Amino acid sequence: VLSPADKTNLKAAWHKLGGHGGEYGAEALERMFATFPTTKTYFPHFDLSHGSAQVQGHGEKVADALLHAVGNLDDLPGALSALSDLHAHKLRVDPVNFKLLSHCLLVTLAAHHPAEFTPAVHASLDKFLATVSTVLTSKYR
């Protein structure tokens, strides 16, 4: 459960991303593809080369979904229900991949905002991404 301090940290962290969410989302995807090559199997129709328009576009989708989640911290299951259905029933993404992408997002955010990436912010972001992952995999059961 996200505490009031976590919610404050998350909103502040997302505010600092400014217009870079899509850029960071794409960078996190590229990190994931490089570090965990098996994740590429879910994107057979994508050009997965550095800076590809398809990876950039999907990075934007990831960032938009997380921004939507941050705006609905008190109802993450409701806010992410359609996305959970999509990943569980249509795309059939292995749930472990959400954890892998979450890790790559944390690394990307820490690399770009080291001063703001305090232990408290890190813990709040980690808890948030774990909660989002849990919600996204809830329809698998």
UniProtKB/Swiss-Prot annotation:
Specify the Globin domain's residue ranges: 1-141
Transcription regulation is among the record's keywords: no
BP-aspect Gene Ontology terms:
hydrogen peroxide catabolic process
Q: Which residues carry this modification: N6-succinyllysine?
A: K7, K11, K16, K40
Residues binding O2, per UniProt: H58
Question: Residues bearing N6-acetyllysine?
Answer: K16
Name the residues that span the membrane.
none
Kindly list the positions at which Phosphoserine occurs in this protein: S3, S49, S102, S124, S138
Which InterPro entries has this protein been placed in? Globin, Globin-like_sf, Globin/Proto, Hemoglobin_a-typ, Hemoglobin_oxygen_transport, Hemoglobin_pi
Q: Which Gene3D superfamilies match?
A: Globins
Superkingdom of origin organism: Eukaryota
Sample GO molecular function, one term = iron ion binding
Phosphothreonine occurs at which residues?
T8, T108, T134, T137
Q: Which PROSITE patterns match?
A: GLOBIN
Question: What cellular-component terms does GO give this entry?
Answer: blood microparticle; haptoglobin-hemoglobin complex; hemoglobin complex
Q: Phosphotyrosine (modified residue): where? A: Y24
| Keyword annotations | Acetylation, Heme, Iron, Metal-binding, Oxygen transport, Phosphoprotein, Transport
Where expressed (tissue)?
Red blood cells.
| Positions annotated to bind heme b | H87
Q: What exactly does this protein do?
A: Involved in oxygen transport from the lung to the various peripheral tissues.
The family classification in the record reads:
Belongs to the globin family.
Assembly mode: Heterotetramer of two alpha chains and two beta chains.
Which protein, by its recorded name, is this?
Hemoglobin subunit alpha
Source species: Tamias striatus (Eastern chipmunk)
Instruction: Write the lineage as a comma-separated list.
Output: Eukaryota, Metazoa, Chordata, Craniata, Vertebrata
